[in-house]
Amino acid sequence: MTRFLLCSFALVLLYPSGIDMYLVGLPRIAQDLGASEAQLHIAFSVYLAGMASAMLFAGRIADRSGRKPVAIVGAVIFVVASLLCAQAHASSHFLVGRFIQGIGAGSCYVVAFAILRDTLDDRRRAKVLSLLNGITCIIPVLAPVLGHLIMLKYPWQSLFYTMTGMGVMVGLLSVFILRETRPTAHPQTATPQHGGSESLLNRFFLSRILITTLSVTAILTYVNVSPVLMMEEMGFDRGTYSMAMALMAMISMAVSFSTPFALSLFTPRTLMLTSQVLFLAAGLALSLATRQTLTLIGLGMICAGFSVGFGVAMSQALGPFTLRAGVASSVLGIAQVCGSSLWIWLAAIIGLSAMNMLIGILIACSIVSLVLLLVVTPPRVAQYDEEAAVES
């Protein structure tokens, strides 16, 4: 079991590392490539577009050909793309490299969740996904620090060489440590009754797609508007802003690492309801805030709400799928990436302020999710195939 957890964690961490590590070198990258920082900020969207593109096919391939081949190919693509970014001499080449890098990270991301679905039952999977969320929260804190230390002595290309090394390590883990976990039965050989229970259009799965997508949209909106809120509206300098973001990351980590213990005391539904109540409270606190302290409390509740509920919701979403876990993971990833991008784009088009953009998604997320949690209940455990057929 340890090998599956180690490989899954490594596969997932390529995604946030590819986002956070290069940001510290953005001014120098823009200078060397003859582009403005604003032009290169699109590299974030390009990276997410690459991830979404990979998710369109990676899950289906993983269900047909196995998790291990997709993990290996994804790691190789990430390595090649990181080298392309390091060798770029024009912004267009850099953006192409970032898109391909997103394809590699997206492939690995999908496979990681499929592996966890293959190897863990509902309760253990919810605990592991909560821990994984906590580990992922460490990356936004550590990656910029590591990037800064690297750039004290080396050029910005070294950031992508570091990512290359990470991709190589993930590839080696996938080749030598990871074992195939895809169930031996093929989806087309499943019985009609079994196949019906794994429909992507069943009401429970659709409800969890919406809940997780809204939750991801809320947390990404917070990340996107935090510089404007803290540095422009609250008057923080860069140092104070970094300290505040580190504090929020610590809240996320503390709650994520506590959630597995909470699952021993409370039901998953209780934790998911708590998550949405925290989102609602955060929205109300931000809308009523007249002091910085209340604003920071509201932002802290966003981090806590996401951390306590997201892993549990993802576990429930994947629960009904044994033979189609890869496709289900892909659908979840695509919905989350596209949904969050759509909201941020629409809010910018409408002209919402940073604070109103955040308050709007928090209120909408909490109300819609609370209704879904109260109305749409999980299928009976008997309908799940909790005994995963793991190939040795």
UniProtKB/Swiss-Prot annotation:
PROSITE patterns: MFS. It is found in: Cell inner membrane. Belongs to the major facilitator superfamily. DHA1 family. MdtL (TC 2.A.1.2.22) subfamily. The gene is mdtL. PANTHER family: CHLORAMPHENICOL EFFLUX PUMP RV0191, PURINE EFFLUX PUMP PBUE. It comes from Klebsiella pneumoniae (strain 342). HAMAP family: MFS_MdtL. This is Multidrug resistance protein MdtL. It is a multi-pass membrane protein. Keywords: Cell inner membrane, Cell membrane, Membrane, Transmembrane, Transmembrane helix, Transport. GO terms for cellular component: plasma membrane. The chain crosses the membrane at residues 4-24, 38-58, 70-90, 95-115, 131-151, 158-178, 209-229, 246-266, 270-290, 294-314, 331-351, 357-377.
